[in-house]
Amino acid sequence: MLPFFSNTTSKSVSVSSFQGSPATPLSFLFFFFLCRAGSSMTGCFTFFLDFIFFFAGVLGPSPMGMYSGASTLTGFFLLRFLGQLSMDLEGLEWLGRASPSWWIFFSSSPSHRVPWGSCASASAPRLPVPHPPSPLSKCPQHPRPRRTKGPGLRKLWGPGPPFFPS
């Protein structure tokens, strides 16, 4: 049963108060599984559904609504982040993941630094760095070869390349 449908009949309904909430168990599971499969394709869709559940909680009573005003706004902003955080915890050992939400969330403030020591990537195994068999000082340093004969680029093409106006 969706949070904004109600089969109960109530005689007095106060529309001005926050009676429903997006942070209901059903909507939490919905956002949790939707955000675990979340990508850039479903980002706009989940953001649109945030507004649906938010306004449904504001405008109508809900049999599953258990939070009031402040936690309604809290759930509205934090539900999708919690779902993405549980998805991103599986891939924290790879720093090459494209913009994980925990990194965006914790590095958004300029005064805050990302706690690298508390994530799994800090204890990831380090790969050995390949070194040359001999130090670089013993390797022959060849100078860059210079052309000594033949027409230069300006003489060959005239005032400029034919495809580039000079």
Curated annotation (Swiss-Prot):
Region (Disordered): 127-166
Disulfide bridges in this chain: none
Main subcellular location: membrane
Membrane topology label: Multi-pass membrane protein
Record localization: Membrane
Gene Ontology CC terms, in alphabetical order: membrane
Alphabetically ordered keywords of this record: Glycoprotein, Membrane, Transmembrane, Transmembrane helix
TM ranges: 15-35, 41-61, 63-83
Residues glycosylated per entry: 7
UniProt keyword Isomerase, yes or no: no
Identification of the protein by name: Putative transmembrane protein encoded by LINC00477
Species the sequence originates in: Homo sapiens
Native organism taxonomy: Eukaryota, Metazoa, Chordata, Craniata, Vertebrata
Designated gene of the protein: LINC00477
